[in-house]
């Protein structure tokens, strides 16, 4: 029971992050208004798509750390991205840029 509760808490923590990423990725106008670089928007959208796969397919296994999402979905990521894009995603996540942009997007888009 505790395990299931802990997993549910992880889902609840991850979902707003994924929702924000999806909205920022799709809403290019807001991204432009926030001066988010185009390459970052593309990266956010890619990660949002990977994250949505977790919500839909693996409801009880959503890693909170986006790097784990990328690691767990390596084959899918490799199929959709070339090597430089994959390195860009890792670099953005490691530098915390992606989280900063998403936090800013949450504020601007008023997603709760």
Protein language model regions, located:
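A charge-rich, low-complexity, intrinsically flexible signal that marks solvent-exposed coils, linkers
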Residues: 2-112
């Amino acid at each position: 029971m505790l395990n299931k509760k802990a997993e549910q808490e992880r889902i609840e923590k991850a979902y707003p992050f994924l929702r924000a990423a999806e909205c920022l990725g799709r809403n290019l106008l807001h991204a432009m208004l926030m001066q988010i670089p185009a390459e970052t928007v593309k990266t956010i959208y890619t990660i949002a798509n990977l994250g949505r796969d977790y919500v839909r397919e693996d409801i009880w296994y959503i890693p909170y750390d986006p790097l784990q999402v990328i690691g767990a979905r390596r084959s899918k990521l490799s199929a959709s991205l070339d090597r430089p894009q994959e390195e860009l995603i890792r670099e953005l996540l490691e530098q915390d840029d992606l989280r900063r942009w998403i936090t800013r997007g949450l504020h601007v888009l008023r997603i709760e």
